[in-house]
Amino acid sequence: MSQSTTLILLPQTAYQNPGNGAPYTVVGNAQPAAAYYLGNRDLQTVNLSVTNIIGNVIIQATLANPATVDNQWFDVYEFNGSDNPNATQYTNVTGNFVYMRAKVVDFQQGLVNYVKLSY
């Protein structure tokens, strides 16, 4: 299957010092995953690009439609910025998910250039 849909899970996001230098969390908007439009399709590709980041990018998914509370989301992939603070990479995520989103936790420095979802 060729990929024909690309959605932005998290647009360009720069660390904004909250005044005390403390890390914080950024949560992107939920986007329909492959199963939302394509029924039993279960392969999604996540592309991400970061520059000089300290923090973790977590990809989450849900089976709820719509997901109305945080405990309906579960982690399906985690990128550790401490291991590779300047990266552009992709990973395949398999699952019959309805929605997916990206979040950055312990965000202390740098730039998330993008996090994209394709299927």
Describe each PLM feature range.
Residues 34-40, 74-119:
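Beta-sandwich interaction modules
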Residues 22-26, 68, 77-84:
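Generic detector of short, locally flexible boundary/turn motifs and exposed helical patches
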Residues 31-60, 98-104:
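Beta-rich globular "head" domains
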Residues 54-75, 114-118:
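Short, surface-exposed beta-strand/strand-loop-strand elements in extracellular ectodomains
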Residues 16-19, 70, 102:
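Generic cytosolic/nucleocytoplasmic N-terminal low-complexity/intrinsically disordered segments
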Residues 1-41:
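Transition segment at domain starts
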Residues 2-5, 48, 71-74, 112:
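N-terminal functional modules and adjacent low-complexity/disordered segments of proteins
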